[in-house]
């Protein structure tokens, strides 16, 4: 335990205030990476390396806390193993699989974006790991059968499936090795511009339910604070750059927005 319960809850409160402020800021300023990358944001590095650097702390920090937790076990803690597996499954894909598959050779991102992403991922991973394997450890073994865990776990899997499936559709648009952007028309892309973000939001809402914690809730809120403005920017970008883009297609939530 690095801090007591009161200090931890105060940290999350401050973290949530920053999330809301970030949401407001990103509604007016497009984060300069990917299709929105532009000069004026300082030194840049290869995008593939940047992605690996900025996402890998999530694996490292959670693994360190999980490892220390294992040393205290008197019996196998299946709940702790399940939460660790959920987290690591997402971040192995996000940190290593996605950058390896993405057609981003030759593309670059600002070092400042990598720096802020490392800071966010480190703090967010610590908040969740501290709760799971220190402050609240252990969850009872019966937790895996509780309604909140079962519903949350199912949502997590559904969201992860949508996220990966949508990424695969985007990858398939560049199977010829070209890096030009194209209009995706398969899967949930028929209804929204950013189903990959929609899936990730569902995923972390599921995590919040499954852990039934302020840590999980703060991550879900942060996910929305980052991905909702990003989805809006991507949708506007499609409309601006493709004259034949389906005008009836929503931004993030099918049939709604």
Where are the regions that the model predicts?
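Hydrophobic transmembrane alpha-helices
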Residues: 2-25, 64-65, 69, 75-76, ...
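Active-site pocket-lining segments that scaffold enzyme catalytic pockets across diverse folds
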Residues: 109-129
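Membrane-helix and juxtamembrane interface regions of eukaryotic multi-pass membrane proteins
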Residues: 1-116, 257
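Juxtamembrane membrane-interface segments at transmembrane alpha-helix termini
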Residues: 95-100, 126, 230-237
């Amino acid at each position: 335990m690095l801090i007591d319960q009161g200090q931890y809850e105060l940290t999350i409160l401050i973290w949530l205030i920053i999330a809301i402020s970030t949401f407001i800021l990103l509604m007016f300023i497009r984060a300069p990476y990917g299709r929105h990358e532009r000069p004026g944001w300082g030194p840049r590095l290869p995008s593939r390396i940047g992605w690996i650097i900025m996402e890998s702390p999530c694996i490292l920090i959670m693994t360190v806390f999980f490892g220390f937790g294992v040393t205290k076990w008197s019996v196998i803690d299946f709940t702790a193993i399940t939460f660790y597996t959920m987290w690591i499954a997402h971040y192995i894909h996000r940190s290593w699989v996605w950058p390896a598959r993405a057609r981003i050779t030759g593309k670059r991102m600002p070092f400042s974006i990598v720096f802020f992403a490392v800071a966010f991922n480190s703090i967010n991973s610590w908040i969740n790991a501290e709760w799971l394997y220190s402050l609240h450890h252990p969850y009872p073994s019966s937790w895996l059968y509780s309604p909140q865990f079962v519903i949350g776990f199912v949502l997590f899997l559904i969201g992860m499936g949508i996220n990966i499936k949508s990424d695969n559709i985007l990858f398939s648009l560049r199977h010829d090795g070209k890096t030009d952007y194209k209009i995706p028309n398969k899967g949930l892309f028929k209804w929204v511009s950013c189903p990959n973000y929609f899936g990730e939001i569902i995923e972390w809402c599921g995590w919040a339910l499954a852990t039934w914690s302020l840590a999980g809730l703060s991550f879900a809120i942060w996910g929305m604070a980052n991905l909702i403005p990003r989805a809006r920017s991507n949708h506007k970008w499609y409309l601006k750059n493709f004259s034949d883009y389906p005008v009836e297609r929503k931004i993030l939530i099918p049939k709604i927005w």
